[in-house]
Amino acid sequence: MTQEVDTVERAAATPDHPQPYRELGLKDDEYERIREILGRRPTDAELAMYSVMWSEHCSYKSSKVHLRYFGETTTEKMRETMLAGIGENAGVVDIGDGWAATFKVESHNHPSYIEPYQGAATGVGGIVRDIMAMGARPVAVMDQLRFGAADAPDTRRVLDGVVRGIGGYGNSLGLPNIGGETVFDASYAGNPLVNALCVGVLRKEDLKLAFASGAGNKIILFGARTGLDGIGGVSVLASETFGGDESGAGRKKLPSVQVGDPFTEKVLIECCLELYAADLVVGIQDLGGAGLSCATSELASAGDGGMRVELERVPLRAANMTPAEILSSESQERMCAVVTPDNVDAFMAVCRKWDVLATDIGEVTDSGRLEITWHGETVVDVPPRTVAHEGPVYERPVQRPDSQDALVANTTASLERPSTGDELRATLLQLLGSPALCSRAFITEQYDRYVRGNTVLAEHADGGVLRVDEQTGRGIAISTDASGRYTALDPYAGAQLALAEAYRNVAVTGATPVAVTNCLNFGSPEDPGVMWQFSQAVRGLADGAAALGIPVTGGNVSFYNQTGTTAILPTPVVGVLGVIDDVKRRIPTGFGTEPGETLILLGDTRDEFDGSIWAQVTADHLGGVPPTVDLDRERLLAEVLTAASRDGLVSAAHDLSEGGLIQAVVEASLAGETGCRIVLPEGWNPFVTLFSESAGRVLVAVPRTEESRFTAMCEARGLPANRIGVVDQGPDGGEPAVEVQGLFTVTLEELRRTSEGVLPGLFG
């Protein structure tokens, strides 16, 4: 039996008809507000639209009041290079020579726990389409991954699926994966974080925006067919009794995780680029979260009129789909374009060339309304702004948790520290052989890092570097970082430390940092303590970007990351984009470019171990105060590194972060397959020098012929620079080693074996 379609006319005539708005996540007052907006009860299709568009994920209703601070702290000077910012599909910045870069990071956390492979794969696909929608060619991806404890039973299932999903989708698209992070912590058990970043490049004049203007212009849906995947809770609308099976209009339970097809998306990318090149698109929007509900309402809301859509024209891949399901489907690999009538034939011809299904489903109107019909009957008639941009805004209670004082007071001062050479050596190997610091090659080798041929630096480097222009060598650098442990101790400082590290990681490649994006992963916004963490992190990130003089161009918020009442560590992920005028002068990570290089430590080392990897691995300790943040010092470091790169004064560079100086030394030695001898300055405490996680520090290798020039430049700029060793190939025929003079020596073979065997042993 076919369910009667709930039309606008029927809704007006049946004001008391019961509707499952609570099951769809709407609160009583939100439902009443919808009735007030419409002057009647919503139809099932309208209810589906409002429920998904007013969700936390789409509306930012709990975070919006705090996110405004980004705009308040962005100066006109910071906006000078920004071509598109917060509110667009992705941020876009001018990178010189007529080029622009667009980048964004988004979460796909919850789907990646339910179905790790498809959750992660479609996370990559979704962020790639955001970049496509700006008029850009996607050129690379990165990822920030968080899993439960490495030895927890479920971590293997989740990690295996997530890594295969990211690699399977990204590799099939032909996009290099040029970096990221993988972190294990018990707080992420049952709630992994899968944050995918994509970067694209375009000529400035090719920028596209998401708006529907020009009455009479056509709305064309193109890409994959629309199915039942990704609908989730909206399926309760398919039955008057909220029951039934999955085969017809009474189906109750539908898949909440989307299913991706990277080969369809690969063709869609090329199709879009040809459409852009032929100037056949007025406005464009990808179909991601909330599907057609989002695309139609956002295009209409951002445009200058309204929109009429004939929903029965939407190509389907499942029988008996209801209007609510069609509007809410999150089937992947779909785009929605606004096209002038004169260009429709040419648009369709390009789609046919690429074998991309394209359908004219409606047109732009001057009514100021979003009207959607189903076989001639109106099922949606709403003001589009009320769906897309004027949803509820909450000022949720914000309260610093009472437990925060005890957490901060519980410092590492009482922990036993290694002091002898043997103890320091054992500590190094303990940290290097832990899931916290071991090699990620088991994961990253499943990704293609060099496809497309424009990757200049990738995994093992602090930031990824890509060539943009073959003729001039102009390129971009990008890094993404986060520290849930530091953010738990001090959310304001933790967010700034993540920003500072991403900024520094871009700078050590020789590039100049120019823009910021973010993905803010937190627990429930209904918890005042979580909202305190969130609000502090936002302010820290915004103030930090202002201090560094680079704009936050966009971002994403992911709330409700918790299992039961246990929230994840607050994890603000920060991405920083940089520009390098010629990728030939990029600075690699590995030692050994030139024989006998001098190793110089830039920055100040302090006794800072609270929240450190050392405390975590050796004592399972989290407490105290995170390292000091000095953003003026970070800017100075970046200026020195850029100048050193331009003048050829530095042959390698590596930032200091987790694990401190000795971890950086080991990584740079392994990357360059060469040994080194560390000589600690007189009076320096060996443990503090080797393992402190003080921020604002970089280890550089300087050719012997340039040492005096480089140190003079640092001195002139007021940047501490201490000679701490030399690159040493080792005795002829002997095994290269890392030697800390007077304390210990470890061969590269032992370091490599210790580091590289951990993850294969756990997950191989």
UniProtKB/Swiss-Prot annotation:
Mg(2+) 1 binds at E106, N556. It is an enzyme of class 6 (ligase). It comes from the Bacteria. Belongs to the FGAMS family. Keywords: ATP-binding, Cytoplasm, Ligase, Magnesium, Metal-binding, Nucleotide-binding, Purine biosynthesis. SUPFAM superfamilies: PurM C-terminal domain-like, PurM N-terminal domain-like. Monomer. Part of the FGAM synthase complex composed of 1 PurL, 1 PurQ and 2 PurS subunits. The keyword Magnesium applies. Its EC number is 6.3.5.3. ATP binds at Y60, K104, N518, G555. It catalyses: N(2)-formyl-N(1)-(5-phospho-beta-D-ribosyl)glycinamide + L-glutamine + ATP + H2O = 2-formamido-N(1)-(5-O-phospho-beta-D-ribosyl)acetamidine + L-glutamate + ADP + phosphate + H(+). Pfam families: AIRS (PF00586), AIRS_C (PF02769), FGAR-AT_linker (PF18072). This is Phosphoribosylformylglycinamidine synthase subunit PurL. The keyword Magnesium applies. It comes from Mycolicibacterium vanbaalenii (strain DSM 7251 / JCM 13017 / BCRC 16820 / KCTC 9966 / NRRL B-24157 / PYR-1).
